[in-house]
Regions:
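Core structural elements
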Residues: 25, 46-54, 68-107, 197-200
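Structured, non-catalytic alpha/beta "coupling" segments that mediate domain-domain communication
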Residues: 41-55, 124-141, 281-292, 297-299
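Short coil/turn segments at secondary-structure boundaries
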Residues: 23-27, 35-40, 60-69, 90-98, ...
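Acidic, turn-prone loop/beta-hairpin segments
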Residues: 64-80, 98-99, 103-177
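Conserved structural-core and active-site-/substrate-pathway-adjacent residues in large, well-folded domains
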Residues: 16, 51, 95-98, 132, ...
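Flexible loop/turn segments at secondary-structure boundaries
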Residues: 7, 21, 29-34, 91, ...
Length: 304
C-alpha cells in the first residue's frame, strides 16, 4: 500500500524466506491488503527461532507430570489447524500453531521424552507447508527419515482429547492470573505463595445457588435452612454475594477435584510463578486469608 513499501528481497536476506512467508500468511486477511509491520516480522522471526530451539530441548525422562495435558492440547491443535487449512484460513492456523508452541515451551520441564518429541514433530509437520526450510531442518534434527514436505499430515486422535483437561487448565490459568495480580499488589519480596482451596461449606452454598439460578430470591432461604451452611461465619454475606452474582456463576467443580488438580500441578505453578507454591485446604491455614477463597477461585497468600 502507499506509504508502506517494503522490498521483499531485502526482507528475505535479513530474516529468511520462511520468516517472510510466515509473517505474510499470519498478517494477511482475505478482506484487506497486507499491512506490513516491522514488529510483526520480528515476532515471526523470534517465533521460528523459538520453535527450532525446542528440537534441542527434548527431555530425557520417559514420563512427565503434564503429558496428558500436553497431548490433549496437541490433538486439539491438530484438529483445529487441519480444519483451518482446509478452509484456507491460514492466518488463524498460524496463530493456533504459535499458541501451541508457546504452550509447549511452557511445559517442557513437565513433559516426558515421547510426549515432547511427538509434539515437536507434529508442530514441524503443521508448519511444513508454510515454512518448508526450517521444517526440513527440524525434521532432520529430530532424526526422522525422508522429508517433512512429503510426510503424512498429522492426524488427531479423539481418544487423546478430554474436556476435563480443558477445565483443569482453566482453573490453573485463573489461579496463576490471580497469584500474579496479588504478587504485583503486594510488591514485597516473597518467599512462598500459599494457595488455599475454598472451605467446603462454600461449595454447598454455591450448589444451592446454582439450583436456584432461575429464582435467586430463594438462595438465602435455602442456604439458611442447610445445616452445613447456616452455622458458618459469613454465610449470610456469602448468600448475598451469590445472589448478586448469580448470572456469572459457572458450573461447580467438586472441592476434592479442585484440590487434586492444583496439588498435582504444584511444581508447575511454582515454575510459572518463579516462587515456591504450596496448595492447601483452607483449614490448614492461619488467619482470614485462608478462608477468602471461593469454589473455582482459591485464596492467595504471599508469605514474605
Amino acid at each position: 500500500s502507499v506509504g508502506n513499501v517494503v522490498d521483499p528481497e531485502e526482507m528475505v536476506k535479513k530474516y529468511g524466506a520462511d520468516t517472510v512467508r510466515l509473517f505474510m500468511l499470519f498478517a494477511a486477511l482475505p478482506e484487506k491488503e497486507l499491512d506490513w509491520s516491522d514488529e510483526g516480522i520480528e515476532g515471526a522471526y523470534r517465533f521460528l527461532n523459538k520453535i527450532y530451539d525446542l528440537v534441542g530441548k527434548i527431555p530425557k525422562t520417559s514420563k512427565g507430570s503434564r503429558d496428558a495435558y500436553v497431548y490433549n492440547r496437541l490433538h486439539k491443535t491438530i484438529r483445529e489447524v487441519t480444519d483451518l487449512m482446509e478452509k484456507m484460513h491460514y492466518n488463524i492456523a498460524v496463530s493456533k500453531i504459535m499458541e501451541f508452541a508457546t504452550y509447549l515451551q511452557k511445559n517442557k520441564e513437565f513433559s516426558g521424552k515421547k510426549c515432547f518429541t511427538d509434539s515437536v514433530k507434529n508442530t514441524c509437520l503443521m508448519l511444513a507447508p508454510m515454512t518448508p526450510h526450517i521444517a526440513e531442518e527440524m525434521w532432520n534434527k529430530l532424526g526422522e527419515k525422508g522429508f517433512a514436505s512429503v510426510a503424512a499430515w498429522p492426524v488427531w486422535d479423539k481418544k487423546m482429547i478430554n474436556e476435563k483437561f480443558d477445565v483443569a487448565e482453566d482453573l490453573i490459568e485463573q489461579t496463576l492470573k490471580d497469584a500474579n495480580a496479588v504478587k504485583y499488589l503486594v510488591r514485597t519480596k516473597a518467599k512462598q505463595i500459599n494457595i488455599y482451596i475454598s472451605p467446603e461449606w462454600k461449595y454447598f452454598a454455591k450448589e444451592i445457588a446454582l439450583k436456584n439460578k432461575k429464582d435467586p430470591k430463594r438462595i438465602m432461604f435455602y442456604m439458611m435452612k442447610d445445616e452445613r451452611v447456616k452455622r458458618q461465619d459469613g454465610a449470610a454475606r456469602y448468600a448475598v454475594h451469590l445472589t448478586k452474582n448469580i448470572m456469572q456463576l459457572k458450573s461447580l467443580m467438586p472441592q476434592k477435584e479442585e484440590y487434586n488438580i492444583l496439588k498435582e500441578n504444584e511444581k508447575f505453578l511454582s515454575y510459572d510463578l518463579e516462587i515456591f507454591v504450596k496448595v492447601m485446604h483452607a483449614n490448614e491455614g492461619i488467619g482470614d486469608r485462608a478462608n477468602r477463597g471461593e469454589p473455582g477461585k482459591p485464596g492467595i497468600e504471599i508469605v514474605s
